[in-house]
Amino acid sequence: MAVVLRLSRAGTHKAPFYHVVATDSRNARDGKYLEDVGIYDPTKRPERIELKVERIEHWLKAGAKPSQTVAMILKRAAKAAAPVAPKA
């Protein structure tokens, strides 16, 4: 079973938001999944990104591969969460 981290669409017509899920690569986009590991809402400004970081790390260590979009979201979240060093 090839596990992937990808987006599952939710919301209404023209107002989507997405769940970040760990699922088998053969399942449909909005089909069954193994675990819900976060939320991504691109309609909010700034974008709403809520991730269960420890569960995402667990799945990545277990061999799950993130989709291109989820990889981009993970990079944005890591960049936003990184502490800013004070200027000397």
From Swiss-Prot:
Membership in a protein family: Belongs to the bacterial ribosomal protein bS16 family.
Arranged from A to Z, the UniProt key words for this protein are: Ribonucleoprotein, Ribosomal protein
Superkingdom, natural source: Bacteria
Recorded protein name is Small ribosomal subunit protein bS16
For molecular function, the Gene Ontology terms on record are: structural constituent of ribosome
Please give the GO cellular component terms listed in this UniProt entry: cytoplasm; small ribosomal subunit
Pfam families, per database record: Ribosomal_S16 (PF00886)
GO BP: any one term: translation
